[in-house]
Amino acid sequence: MSKTWRPATQLVHGGTLRSQYGETSEAIYLTQGFVYETSEAAEARFKGETEGFIYARYGSPTNDMFEKRMCMLEGAEDARATASGMAAVTAAILCQLKSGDHIVAARALFGSCRWVVETLAPKYGIDCTLIDGRDLANWEKAITPKTKVFFLESPTNPTLEVIDIAGVAKLANQIGAKVVVDNVFATPLFQKPLELGAHIVVYSATKHIDGQGRCLGGVVLSDKEWIDENLHDYFRHTGPAMSPFNAWTLLKGIETLPLRVRQQTENAAKIADFLAEQGKVAKVIYPGRKDHPQADIIAKQMTGGSTLVAFELKGGKDAAFALQNALEIIKISNNLGDSKSLITHPATTTHKNLTDEARAELGISPGTVRLSAGIEDTDDLIEDFARALGKVSA
């Protein structure tokens, strides 16, 4: 298989494993276990002396195809597909830590990710320090002799802050810590954390990789040594494996990832520019705009903008609700990366469990709204916003 294939080709052909029947579409191997020709063959398989599958909780041919395709796209040596994005995040963090270890995490995280490092990890004796990840000095100040993991997402959910991944990786390497990056918002098409120095990348495949709101899934990607030493046993014994059916569904979704993301990004950029000109909008945050606070870092580490737009309405929560309720094409939903345009009010949905103070620190105000642009006609989406804004009180 050619390593020179470009992403669009990798996503259609990468990792394909055909049976003796020569099917054009990847097969779904819906089986719990696998048969061995002899007892000796079973023994050798379990000893690791021969390659092959043992049990679907450990891996399956369908999952293997999906993992290999993700590795090609990300530039990773190895990967494990998980039942959800949160299963991937939890596995990537907990599999390499023990009681007494310390995590430094950017405070701007998806609500459930923040719960894992701030609430779950301490139950196992793992300390966590949350920082404003935009300033590299904060990462350095938070380091202790027990620091083993740096965790961040970039761009962040929902306010699209950007963190200097290469800078964080440099600090981590100085102390032998690992950098885990949640790359969901950038997608592997616009940002490759491993090339920037990160050690582990996680995705919620539920989002852009599926792209059509059908199934849950996640992926952890890293070098083979790290996977073997940290994730292998955790994966076998705790059971976060993706189902073969979901792996097959994601194989179908990922084929069109470049086409969808291209249209979604074009829509997001044009909608961001439109919203920036509206009097009822206090501010717009979009990684493709020159007025983004971290535009210099974006130019250095990202090759494209985003399918997401964050904006703040002057009228606060009432204005946000009025806008969302008046939209016709764009649907209210907390999901993202879908072919359909989706909108949500983070303060009352994805980040509702944070205190008012914590939300304010993240830049989430009562008027903050997050748009996940879909693949619809751009003009229809802008007209939908124009109509809805007309129903928002000044």
Model-found features: residue ranges?
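A common structural junction motif
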Residues: 238-239, 326-337, 388-394
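Conserved N-terminal alpha-helix of the aminotransferase class I/II PLP-enzyme fold
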Residues: 38-87, 112-119
